[in-house]
């Protein structure tokens, strides 16, 4: 069994001639061949980026403290600023009219839905050949699965988490209520993705891929709502997110288990070494576990609790209606009896008036 590898943050794997090969300009692991697979979407992206910006994604390198947004102080500053701006923005908008921003919000959500779909396809295109050639465990645990194209795509997903912070500012400007879950989730996710890139966890592609698929659905839902379209499957968006966290935790716990068993030399009880820094694994477990709890509470309060309250209100209304109907029937009965008594008195008066002699005789007797 090989020893656990030392982490080299500046190691890059390159893509050459349709195979995954090691870049000789960097130290690190050996190459891994997946055959002559074609990567049409990746090739298209390189051509587009080259024509537009004069740079190709295939030349990207992620180096801690050198690449933009790759240092911990910068990340911390952005997240702290995000929370401070929420507080300041709320105070500024307190006595102001809400800003609608309806069209901008529509395009924003549609753009994120489409971008998430494209990024998910790009990641799948890179991972599928490795799974086909070497198996699923290789793709989530082997250090050779940490390739240059995937690093670039992870970095794109990472940057998108900072862009998604603008969700909150839309809500502030529109004077919509902000929930703790929303603000916490946005800030924590940016930090989480940062820890995974720095920690070089090979399982990252799976967690990010699932998240992107959720975002395709979620942002499309928000797009429809922003257009004023009534969407009946809102509840399923939250359910999809909860399923995502269960899946994430299942895969991460498996990876952590097999790595711990490997380090303890219980080789028969594990599938081998799982690459990545232990701190990154801990951050993943802690953060996603907190998401799962918060989303389940949100789901219960929003759907289950509200549904129970609606049922209770409906039952109370029905009981009140039945009580009102019973009271109405009782009133009708009393009125009917009263009318009958009045009719009887009138009838007696008529008889007395028609037969006064008879009445007098009766009185004399």
From Swiss-Prot:
GO terms for biological process: fatty acid elongation, monounsaturated fatty acid; fatty acid elongation, polyunsaturated fatty acid; fatty acid elongation, saturated fatty acid; sphingolipid biosynthetic process; very long-chain fatty acid biosynthetic process. GO terms for cellular component: cytosol; endoplasmic reticulum membrane; nuclear membrane; nucleus. The keyword Transmembrane helix applies. This is Putative fatty acid elongase 2. Its main location: endoplasmic reticulum. The chain crosses the membrane at residues 69-89, 112-132, 150-170, 180-198, 205-225, 242-262, 279-299. Its EC number is 2.3.1.199. It catalyses: a very-long-chain acyl-CoA + malonyl-CoA + H(+) = a very-long-chain 3-oxoacyl-CoA + CO2 + CoA. Keywords: Endoplasmic reticulum, Fatty acid biosynthesis, Fatty acid metabolism, Glycoprotein, Lipid biosynthesis, Lipid metabolism, Membrane, Transferase, Transmembrane, Transmembrane helix. Pfam families: ELO. GO terms for molecular function: fatty acid elongase activity. May be involved in the synthesis of very long chain fatty acids. Belongs to the ELO family. It comes from the Eukaryota. Residues 90-111, 171-179, 226-241, 300-365 are cytoplasmic. Residues 1-68, 133-149, 199-204, 263-278 are lumenal. It is an enzyme of class 2 (transferase). It is found in: Endoplasmic reticulum membrane. It is a multi-pass membrane protein.
């Amino acid at each position: 069994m090989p020893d656990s590898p030392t982490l080299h943050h500046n190691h890059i794997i390159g893509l050459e001639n349709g195979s995954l090969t090691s870049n000789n300009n960097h130290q690190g692991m050996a190459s891994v061949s997946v055959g002559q697979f074609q990567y049409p979407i990746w090739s298209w992206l390189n051509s587009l980026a080259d024509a537009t910006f004069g740079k190709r994604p295939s030349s990207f390198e992620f180096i801690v403290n050198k690449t933009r947004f790759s240092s911990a102080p910068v990340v911390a500053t952005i997240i702290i600023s995000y929370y401070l701006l929420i507080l300041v923005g709320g105070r500024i908008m307190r006595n102001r009219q809400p800003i609608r921003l309806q069209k901008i919000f529509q395009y924003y959500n549609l753009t994120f839905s489409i971008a998430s779909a494209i990024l998910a396809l790009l990641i799948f295109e890179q991972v599928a050949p490795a799974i086909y050639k070497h198996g699923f465990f290789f793709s989530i645990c082997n250090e050779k699965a940490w390739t240059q194209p995937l690093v670039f795509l992870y970095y794109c997903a990472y940057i998108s988490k900072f862009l998604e912070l603008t969700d909150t500012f839309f809500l502030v400007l529109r004077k919509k209520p902000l929930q703790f879950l929303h603000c916490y989730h946005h800030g924590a996710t940016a930090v989480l993705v940062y820890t995974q890139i720095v920690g070089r966890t090979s399982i990252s592609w799976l967690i990010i891929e699932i998240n992107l698929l959720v975002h395709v659905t979620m942002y499309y839902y928000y797009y429809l709502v922003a257009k004023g379209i009534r969407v009946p499957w809102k509840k399923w968006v939250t359910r999809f997110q909860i399923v995502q966290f269960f899946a994430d935790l299942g895969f991460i716990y498996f990876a952590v288990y097999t790595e711990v068993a490997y380090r303890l030399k219980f080789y028969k009880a594990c599938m081998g070494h799982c690459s990545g820094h232990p701190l990154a694994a801990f951050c993943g477990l802690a953060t996603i576990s907190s998401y799962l709890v918060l989303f389940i509470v949100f789901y219960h309060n929003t759907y289950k609790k509200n549904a129970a309250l609606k049922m209770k209100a409906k039952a109370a209304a029905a009981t009140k209606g039945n009580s009102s109907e019973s009271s109405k029937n009782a009133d009708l009965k009393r009125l009917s009896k009263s009318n009958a008594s009045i009719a009887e008195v009138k009838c007696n008066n008529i008889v007395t008036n028609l037969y006064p002699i008879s009445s007098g005789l009766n009185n004399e007797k």
